[in-house]
């Protein structure tokens, strides 16, 4: 019985440590990825381009006015890790984060 409990606790500890890896990797991005580290709300499109370079894609948003740029930060678990920068219709940063533009540009009225 005690061996079973020890096994369960060990498995839980390993899963907890693995879950923390994503948060740690993203924290590392705050120091090494210019698009994550230096791009701030209110910056112009030209400032973002100067800091982050050319995005891998840019699309017009459907549920907001403006455009959304996607940057590829690297690979994680065989998939591209993406970071978006959303710009309003005047070309200034309104938001950014670890999503694709499609994930970010969703209908706020849609049921979840």
From Swiss-Prot:
Keywords: Cell inner membrane, Cell membrane, Lipoprotein, Membrane, Palmitate, Signal
Pfam families per UniProt: BamE
Conditions for induction: By elevated osmotic pressure in the growth medium.
Any one GO CC term of the record: outer membrane
Database matches in Gene3D superfamilies: 3.30.1450.10
Any one GO biological process: response to osmotic stress
Main location: membrane
Protein's UniProt name: Osmotically-inducible putative lipoprotein OsmE
Gene that produces this protein: osmE
């Amino acid at each position: 019985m005690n061996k079973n409990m020890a096994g369960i606790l060990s498995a839980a500890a390993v899963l907890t440590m693995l879950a923390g890896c994503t948060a740690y990797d993203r924290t590392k991005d705050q120091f090494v990825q210019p698009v994550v580290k230096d791009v701030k709300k209110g910056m112009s499109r030209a400032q973002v381009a100067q800091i982050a370079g050319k995005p891998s894609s840019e699309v017009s948003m459907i549920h907001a006015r403006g455009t959304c740029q996607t940057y590829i930060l690297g690979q994680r678990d065989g998939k591209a890790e993406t970071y978006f920068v959303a710009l309003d219709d005047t070309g200034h940063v309104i938001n950014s984060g670890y999503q694709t533009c499609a994930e970010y540009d969703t209908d706020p009225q849609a049921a979840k």
